[in-house]
Swiss-Prot record:
The lineage of its organism: Bacteria, Bacillati, Actinomycetota, Actinomycetes, Micromonosporales. GO terms for biological process: regulation of translational fidelity; translation. This is Aspartyl/glutamyl-tRNA(Asn/Gln) amidotransferase subunit C. Heterotrimer of A, B and C subunits. The keyword Nuclease does not apply. NCBIfam families: gatC. It comes from Salinispora arenicola (strain CNS-205). It holds the Pfam family GatC.
Length: 101
């Protein structure tokens, strides 16, 4: 398996909106390469005799009845909030750019 390049790490950092120094690019490339090699080894395991599962242990009766129980009113839920608007928590905007681009 080919090693992950510094350019690929820089691209992933940009997509993740992470500020990464040149020194960190090299370190991260090495670390990600080790992770990818481990994932490749897992993919090589022959498991034809093992049935596919969604959990490592069997799960039964994991759902509970949907019972209406007392809960907080909107006013009670928002009472400790620093800012609220129209019965909703109001938080500062974190994205200053158009998400579609």
């Amino acid at each position: 398996m080919a090693a992950i390049s510094r350019e690929e790490v820089a691209h992933l950092a940009r997509l993740s909106r992470l500020a990464v120094t040149e020194e960190e690019l090299g370190t991260l490339a090495g670390q990600l390469d080790v992770i990818l090699q481990a994932v490749a080894q897992v993919g090589e395991v022959t498991a034809a005799d093992i049935p596919p599962t969604s959990h490592s242990v069997p799960l039964t009766n994991v759902l509970r009845d949907d019972v209406v129980a007392p809960c907080l009113s909107p006013q009670e839920a928002l009472s400790g909030a620093p800012d609220a608007e129209e019965q909703r928590f109001r938080v500062p905007r974190i994205l200053d750019e158009d998400v579609a681009s």
